[in-house]
Structure formats: C-alpha cells, structure tokens
C-alpha cells in the first residue's frame, strides 16, 4: 500500500477546502481522507490539517502520479496559500 500524506502548517478555509476535495477525489485509483489535527503528545501540534491519498500498490501510485488530476491537486493546494509538505510512504503489514 502506498500513502501520500499532506501536512498543512495552518488552518484551511473549510469552504475553499471543500473545492479542493472535489479535485482530490478525481485522482485515479486513490482513496482520499482529510481532517483537522487536534493535538500532539507534548505541546501544540506542528500542523493544523492533514490529508492523505492511498493506493493499493506502487504501480497504481505511479500511474496516478503521472496523471493530470494529481498534478492539479498540487497546484490547487499551493493556490490556497497555506504552507504544506507532502511525503510518500510504502506501508507493509
């Protein structure tokens, strides 16, 4: 399983993010989830919002990553104006 996770440094506007979700759900073969970061083990959390894409395998991820839908989600995320980072992980049992 492959997961792309997005960590936003600030709060996102809920109405604007709802528009972003429509683009994210159009990425082929991916599950998409998102939500507010509400805490950390010690102190305040470094991030305020979290989103993730999930693909069943590396081939599905590679195919989606080459597509225009995935690229559009990145452009749209940048247009929201909230600093964020993206990382990719390969998960195993």
For the regions a protein language model found, what residue spans apply to each?
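Helix-adjacent hinge/juxtasegments
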Residues: 80, 86-87
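A common structural junction motif
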Residues: 24-28, 70-75, 81
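Short S/T/G/P-rich N-terminal loop/turn motif that feeds into the first structured element of a domain
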Residues: 1-66, 87-93
